[in-house]
Amino acid sequence: MINVYSNLMSAWPATMAMSPKLNRNMPTFSQIWDYERITPASAAGETLKSIQGAIGEYFERRHFFNEIVTGGQKTLYEMMPPSAAKAFTEAFFQISSLTRDEIITHKFKTVRAFNLFSLEQQEIPAVIIALDNITAADDLKFYPDRDTCGCSFHGSLNDAIEGSLCEFMETQSLLLYWLQGKANTEISSEIVTGINHIDEILLALRSEGDIRIFDITLPGAPGHAVLTLYGTKNKISRIKYSTGLSYANSLKKALCKSVVELWQSYICLHNFLIGGYTDDDIIDSYQRHFMSCNKYESFTDLCENTVLLSDDVKLTLEENITSDTNLLNYLQQISDNIFVYYARERVSNSLVWYTKIVSPDFFLHMNNSGAININNKIYHTGDGIKVRESKMVPFP
């Protein structure tokens, strides 16, 4: 284990621990702590990428939990065009127990944003961006459940927006798949990527249990959202279930990232269990829920209730790459009301960017069992598996 320490007031994380590889082909696992100011951040991958990923997650969480700067207080119709204000009103009406009049007349704290398509500057409610309970405390009654879906951090604004778009597509694809139980295609669990650490993870997981890989991309969308599932009945294995998801412009890239994410979740849960921790030690409700899903039945429930829209199992990973323009055109056909929150700061003489993509016409967060706008432009109550509308997706 390698530990790196920084000063208390440093912009950089307090402690970083890099665990040794299980073998020369396995990915590195890096974790970051910061004097309990944020929840730990982690990443897996090739050595440098795991370090970069963990640091990026640290900066992202630090910003969205602690550093959201709000503007003045305005009503929805004062801060944005009427069509967007109406969409947010309907979303908050579903989420809260308040009337439309109460939502329309309420003055929300604001943050700056721009429309994803027109690039027009506007403001949006800070409560859908800030993850703490202080920044927009008076607005929490309209939007109590929040998460990091759609968030991104990068040294380039374009790359940060691209990261947010991928996060956004992952969330929408995952929730629609969970609620409807439909996947586009299945990818062979015996797939070979030609990338050492990816193939090594798949080999290790296959030797211990079962793997299923599904393309769950939103219907008609360019690119690929790949969900990788792992489950085992092995009684001596601490980890019975794990999963990873990634959206990318090529199938191979999405698959590889989803496998790494599955492995990251696997290692995090394994470290937690061997450390002797319990549910009482977990603050994050998503992580607490994911820990409760650590059973083989979570794997079988997903696999047995997945309807494939195509019976063909993919045996190879073609390299068809879609452009961001195609994705933007696809999203705009569904809704014009997609917005990008953005902020920047200087870290060690470099400019870095934070972004988050949100839309009242899509799922606003990932907890479908909580206070959410479940009726939107891509899903309506009763369109899928009814029992799942009140049961959170088994995902970290």
Swiss-Prot record:
The gene is mcbD. GO terms for biological process: antibiotic biosynthetic process. This is Microcin B17-processing protein McbD. InterPro entries: YcaO-like_dom. The keyword Cytoplasm applies. Necessary to process the inactive microcin B17 (McbA) precursor into the active peptide. Pfam families: YcaO (PF02624). Keywords: Antibiotic biosynthesis, Cytoplasm, Plasmid. Residues 41-396 form the YcaO domain.
